[in-house]
A protein has these predicted regions:
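Local beta-strand/beta-hairpin segments that build beta-sheet-rich folds
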Residues: 26, 58-59
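Short, small/polar residue-rich loop motifs at catalytic or cofactor-binding pockets
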Residues: 12-13, 31-33
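Polybasic "coupling" helices that flank or enter modular domains
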Residues: 109-155
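Glycine- and acidic-residue-biased ligand/ion/polar-headgroup-sensing regions
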Residues: 34-47, 52, 63-64
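Short phosphate-coordinating micro-motif centered on Lys-Gly-acidic
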Residues: 24-32
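Cyclic-nucleotide recognition modules
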Residues: 59-116
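A cytosolic small-molecule/anion-sensing beta-strand core signal
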Residues: 21, 40-41, 62, 88
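Cyclic nucleotide-binding regulatory module and flanking cytosolic helices
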Residues: 1-25, 66, 71-75
Length: 155
């Protein structure tokens, strides 16, 4: 995906950034949020808390990446789909109001193409993770996730 275009676009629009330290949370599952976040620098972990209180890691994301784009494009507020915690020493995020972000997307063909590719990639990764979880034991799942992380680092 053309991450450069997204980052350049946000820079040109002078979108403010948010800095977070290691292990700080950007969002919590279920909390209302008004902004879309784009990870500019760093690594974050997305997770949810299971009913029994254990944390279930969904994925690790490295910059650049869109963090909170899931859900609809017209609501000013939406609930966070997962927890987002900084795993690197620090992380920098662009913070843009959701409605404003979608207005930009709807007016810019190149940005629309980027978002479409983003959704396709996210869907593909979600299906892959689901396959791993349903077909393998927990130990094998962890090994597969580790291999996937190594693959992502090489990209």
């Amino acid at each position: 995906m053309g991450h450069e275009y997204l980052l350049e676009f946000l820079e040109k629009k002078d979108i403010p950034t948010v800095h977070k330290a290691r292990h700080a949370y950007l969002t919590y599952y279920g909390f209302e949020q008004q902004s879309t976040y784009v990870l500019k620098e760093g690594v974050v972990k997305t997770s949810i808390i299971l009913r029994d209180g254990r944390e279930f890691n969904i994925s690790y994301l490295k910059a650049p990446n869109i963090i909170s784009l899931l859900k609809d494009e017209v609501s000013q507020y939406t609930s966070a789909p997962f927890n987002v915690r900084v795993e690197s020493e620090s992380a920098v995020f662009y913070k843009i109001p959701r409605v404003t972000f979608w207005e930009y997307v709807n007016k810019d063909k190149k940005l629309q193409d980027y978002i479409n590719a983003y959704y396709r990639e996210e869907l593909s990764q979600a299906i892959y993770r689901q396959q791993l979880m349903t077909m393998e034991k927990q130990e094998q799942y962890v090994r597969s996730c580790t291999c996937r992380l190594n693959h992502l680092e090489r990209k």
